[in-house]
């Protein structure tokens, strides 16, 4: 959150059984925490989106490759941030590939779709990407083909899945429309695509998580309250991150506020229903909590590892793990009208 960045090769972290503590991934100060974890090639562009609705970019090779214990370099050494401006989201884009759209989502549930070609010629001082309401910020940017299904996930375990055609393509500097109707005190924690045959992996702040096929989530119209994606309680903590798994993804990495990383096989994560709580994925230290997830497949790695299968530990199963999908569907009157944010 204080604006440091770095890169490491994935095989810095060997696969572990789920439920472990992990190992050091990034040095942080007491008043700092890890915010983004993602996979990239050194030839890709890293697009940095800020709390002021701007985007700047640099080549991934400009990010320092350092050890897990190192903090990295300040982003201000790589791109032209304004005083007190903070990076809230990072998107990795292949060089020269300007097809499709970018769909933005904010912490307060606003969404917007813009042609990626609008960002083909980024100036050194960046470009305006979205007009934001006071106190809101861009949390996620998903690249789409124009025919994709997308989903928002909230801290209280709600999710809404909708087709991107529900969103008209708008100009680069325009505001957003309502993606999900949030209860008071709730906020969006993840915005992900829903690939055919894929699944949603989500995790609570205390390291409890699960995997649910996207087929368990019905397609809705944007703007409603959504359906229950996870049951939460004091043991699970609030949902803090979610990632969309494709059939090609083999590995999952989770990182905590204090920079501890664990890498495991996707197949180790139990597949269960929407209203289940899940199993222990990671065991954060006292005072620490999980903050981010990332998934990747063999194409992202320089090697392929095969580990022995992990048996399900009965002590890690939580009450309510029946996987019953019958509860908590939102009613039809939860669908909201478009809310346009005036520039």
Region roles according to the model:
Residues 1-343:
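Short, structured "edge-of-domain" segments at secondary-structure transitions
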């Amino acid at each position: 959150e204080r604006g440091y960045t770095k890169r490491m090769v994935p095989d810095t972290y060997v696969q572990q059984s789920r439920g472990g503590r992990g190992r050091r991934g990034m040095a942080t100060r007491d008043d700092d925490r890890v915010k983004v974890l993602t996979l990239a090639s050194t030839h890709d562009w890293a697009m940095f989106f800020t709390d002021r609705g701007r985007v700047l970019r640099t080549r991934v090779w400009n990010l320092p490759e350092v050890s897990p214990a190192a903090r990295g370099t300040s982003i201000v050494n790589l791109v032209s941030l304004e005083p007190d401006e903070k990076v809230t989201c990072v998107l990795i884009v292949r060089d020269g590939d300007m097809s499709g759209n970018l769909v933005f989502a904010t912490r307060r549930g606003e969404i917007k779709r813009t042609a990626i070609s609008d960002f083909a010629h980024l100036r050194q001082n960046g470009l305006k990407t979205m007009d934001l309401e006071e106190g809101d910020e861009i949390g996620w940017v998903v690249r789409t083909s124009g025919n994709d299904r997308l989903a928002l996930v909230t801290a209280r375990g709600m999710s809404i899945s909708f087709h991107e055609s529900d969103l008209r393509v708008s100009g680069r500097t325009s505001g957003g429309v309502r993606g999900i109707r949030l209860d008071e005190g709730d906020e969006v924690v993840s915005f992900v695509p829903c690939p055919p045959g894929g699944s949603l992996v989500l995790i609570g702040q205390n390291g409890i998580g699960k995997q649910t096929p996207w087929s368990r989530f019905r397609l809705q119209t944007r703007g409603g309250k959504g359906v229950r994606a996870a049951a939460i309680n004091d043991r699970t903590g609030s949902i803090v991150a979610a990632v969309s798994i494709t059939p090609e993804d083999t590995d999952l990495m989770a990182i905590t506020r204090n920079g501890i990383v664990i890498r495991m096989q996707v197949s180790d994560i139990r597949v269960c229903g929407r209203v289940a709580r899940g199993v222990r994925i990671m065991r954060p230290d006292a005072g620490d909590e999980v903050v981010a997830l990332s998934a990747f497949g063999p194409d992202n790695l320089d090697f392929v590892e095969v580990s022995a299968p992990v048996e399900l530990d009965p002590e890690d199963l939580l009450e309510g793990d029946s996987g019953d999908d019958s509860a908590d569907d939102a009613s039809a009157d939860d669908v909201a009208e478009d809310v346009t944010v005036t520039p």
